[in-house]
């Protein structure tokens, strides 16, 4: 199904050509959703921007457009408002036809991408020998949501986990473990990840304070990089231990990822330097090899270079990221590469992308996007920390969310004097708890910081996961109470939209394709959350104002269709956020 806004655009594009000639065939008619329902459903703003070019008043341009506009089957008579806006109100008969098409459409009107693209989404990316913390939450959840939406649109998506599995920290850790716990370097599972993290912190202190230790650690890195068998075995054991712990969290959150860590690109680093040199882009600065960039300066206003090879001959994150771009473009054949990391890395990626374009690693037909996000804050407005000032571990945060959800559920069951099985309580608490964490993050504009609050995210009122899940469960309760299987409703039955609440709900249901298209373009998942929240509110108003099971036919079946379409839209939308629905709560 073509999105409603796209259908309207096509009609106005035809009118532009009829009214003002073929020169206007590619002119965007500037159709937007109406800012206020009092003015209709959509608005055309092209008259104001064309007036100067056509040397006419905006209202005259609007009148000419309407004269040649064929839109009677979609809209009521358009109205010219203010200086030249054209207000459009959809016809109930058109809404009924469009909704009828959705009844047998599993995709609920969302078309598949044409053409489909090969897209890489790079997200999560924790560091080996460190536990995942709250900072990884946003990258993991936002990246997964973006990947789900692109996959639903039938793009070919590669989900990559660019784990930090290489570098000086391994020489440091291996050197320390050789002294303190040598069995960890030869035996699988000799340590758990928490112990590894503790040893890593101690190793870092030794590295910073003990010159002999620092030199031994550097030699250990050289041995590792040169392929020394014992060093490689120790490194692989450390990676495997971390990997197993990461996977536990990915399984809990239902995250699918292909690991391709920093070490994967080691064989390609020297070739990157060679290509940059061949193109005359390298400059030596204090023994390091750099690329000077346009528009980047330090505090003194001096040109700021991107270092790609350190003075000691080692490589850095920039070199690895350039090698990754080369591989993703040349081997993966990616047409769009999306990096989901915190906003603090914006400058780094801007520099890397510029070098990649200068060097020809990034052709014009490949888009690279940094999906930046803000911080997770505590209720004190500061970066979320434990009481002791430590970074909050992601596993502990998720466990606490489930515990809070369980406490809320048990309290509600007691107040309702309801008895449920242990399995029901455990599953519901886990689903609601984890969904609340995901939704609280995704419902925020990712550019902003947000305050993490269990109380707010688990609230049954407001823009929260429990509110959405409850709206879905409420529809299913109609099915149970009426002994109705929505799938048994005849697709040949009529859809009748008379009540204002029905019309408002119908219009919201039909906006899903526009919303999915917008999120695919601007990569802002909160748009989908906002849509689902509005849908839930409009359904609740419909439920309050329009009897369903007590209505006479054919109104009853028509309203049952609206209920079913609402439930299906909520289920689909929530699944794209990585949230499963519950039939009962």
Swiss-Prot record:
UniProt xrefs under SMART domains: Arg_tRNA_synt_N (SM01016), DALR_1 (SM00836)
Database matches in Pfam families: Arg_tRNA_synt_N, DALR_1, tRNA-synt_1d
This protein's GO CC annotations: cytoplasm
Motif range ('HIGH' region): 126-136
A single MF term (Gene Ontology): arginine-tRNA ligase activity
Annotated Gene3D superfamilies: Arginyl tRNA synthetase N-terminal domain, HUPs, Isoleucyl-tRNA Synthetase, Domain 1
Alphabetically ordered keywords of this record: Aminoacyl-tRNA synthetase, ATP-binding, Cytoplasm, Ligase, Nucleotide-binding, Protein biosynthesis
E.C. number: 6.1.1.19
GO biological process, one term: arginyl-tRNA aminoacylation
Catalytic reaction list: tRNA(Arg) + L-arginine + ATP = L-arginyl-tRNA(Arg) + AMP + diphosphate
SUPFAM superfamilies, alphabetized: Anticodon-binding domain of a subclass of class I aminoacyl-tRNA synthetases, Arginyl-tRNA synthetase (ArgRS), N-terminal 'additional' domain, Nucleotidylyl transferase
Alphabetized InterPro entries for the sequence: aa-tRNA-synth_I_CS, Arg-tRNA-ligase, Arg-tRNA-synth_N, Arg-tRNA-synth_N_sf, ArgRS_core, DALR_anticod-bd, Rossmann-like_a/b/a_fold, tRNAsynth_Ia_anticodon-bd
PROSITE patterns reported in the protein's UniProt record: AA_TRNA_LIGASE_I (PS00178)
CDD domains the UniProt entry points to: Anticodon_Ia_Arg, ArgRS_core
Location, primary (coarse class): cytoplasm
Subcellular location: Cytoplasm
NCBIfam families: argS
Family the UniProt entry places it in: Belongs to the class-I aminoacyl-tRNA synthetase family.
Subunit composition and interactions: Monomer.
Protein name: Arginine--tRNA ligase
């Amino acid at each position: 199904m073509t999105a409603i806004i796209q259908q309207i655009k096509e009609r106005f594009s035809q009118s532009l050509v009829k009214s003002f000639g073929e020169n206007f065939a590619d002119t965007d008619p500037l159709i937007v959703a109406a800012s206020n329902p009092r003015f209709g459903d959509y608005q055309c703003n092209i008259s104001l921007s064309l007036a100067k070019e056509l040397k006419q008043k905006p209202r005259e341009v609007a009148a000419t457009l309407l004269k040649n506009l064929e839109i009677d089957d979609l809209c009521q008579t358009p109205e010219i408002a203010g200086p030249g806006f054209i207000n459009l109100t959809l016809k109930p008969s058109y809404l009924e036809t469009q909704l009828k098409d959705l009844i047998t459409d599993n995709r609920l009107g969302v078309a598949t991408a044409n053409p489909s693209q090969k897209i890489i989404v790079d997200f999560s990316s924790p560091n080996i020998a460190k536990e995942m913390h709250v900072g990884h939450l946003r990258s993991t959840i936002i990246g997964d949501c973006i990947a789900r939406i692109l996959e639903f649109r039938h793009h070919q998506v590669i989900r990559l986990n660019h784990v930090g599995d290489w570098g000086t920290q391994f020489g440091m850790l291996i050197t320390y473990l050789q002294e303190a716990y040598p069995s960890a370097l030869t035996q699988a599972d000799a340590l758990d990840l928490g112990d590894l993290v503790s040893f890593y912190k101690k190793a870092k202190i030794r590295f910073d304070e003990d010159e002999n230790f620092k030199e031994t650690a550097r030699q250990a890195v050289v041995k590792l990089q040169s392929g020394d068998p014992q060093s490689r075995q120790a490194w692989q054991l450390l990676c495997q231990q971390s990997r197993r712990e990461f996977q536990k969290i990915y399984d809990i959150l239902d995250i699918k990822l292909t690991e391709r860590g920093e070490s994967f690109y080691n064989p390609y680093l020297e070739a990157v330097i060679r290509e940059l040199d061949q193109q005359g882009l390298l400059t030596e600065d204090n023994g390091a090899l750099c690329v000077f960039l346009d528009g980047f300066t330090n505090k003194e206003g001096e040109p700021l270079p991107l270092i790609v090879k350190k003075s000691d001959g080692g490589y850095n994150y920039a070199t690895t990221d350039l090698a990754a771009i080369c591989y993703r473009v040349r081997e993966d054949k990616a047409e769009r590469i999306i990096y989901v990391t915190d906003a603090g890395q914006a400058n780094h990626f801007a520099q890397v992308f510029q070098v990649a374009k200068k060097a020809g690693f990034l052709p014009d037909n490949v888009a690279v996007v940094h999906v930046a996000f803000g911080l997770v804050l505590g209720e004190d407005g500061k970066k979320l920390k434990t009481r002791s000032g430590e970074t909050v571990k992601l596993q502990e945060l998720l466990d606490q969310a489930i515990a809070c959800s369980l406490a809320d559920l048990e309290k509600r069951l007691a107040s309702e004097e309801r008895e449920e099985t242990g399995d029901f309580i455990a599953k519901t608490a886990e689903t609601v708890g984890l969904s609340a964490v995901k939704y609280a993050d995704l419902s925020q504009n990712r550019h902003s910081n947000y305050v993490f609050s269990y109380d707010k995210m688990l609230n049954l009122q407001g823009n929260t996961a429990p509110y959405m899940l409850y709206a879905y469960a409420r529809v299913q309760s109609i099915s149970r109470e009426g002994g109705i299987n929505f799938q048994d409703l005849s697709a040949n039955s009529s859809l009748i939209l008379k009540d204002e609440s029905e019309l408002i709900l119908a219009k919201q249901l039909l906006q899903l394709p526009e919303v999915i298209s917008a999120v695919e373009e601007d990569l802002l998942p909160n748009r989908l959350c906002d849509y689902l929240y509005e849908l839930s509110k409009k359904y609740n108003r419909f439920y309050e104002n329009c009897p369903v099971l007590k209505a006479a036919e054919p109104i009853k079946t028509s309203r049952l269709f609206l209920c079913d379409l609402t439930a299906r839209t909520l289920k689909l939308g929530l699944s794209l956020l990585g949230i499963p629905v519950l039939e009962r709560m």
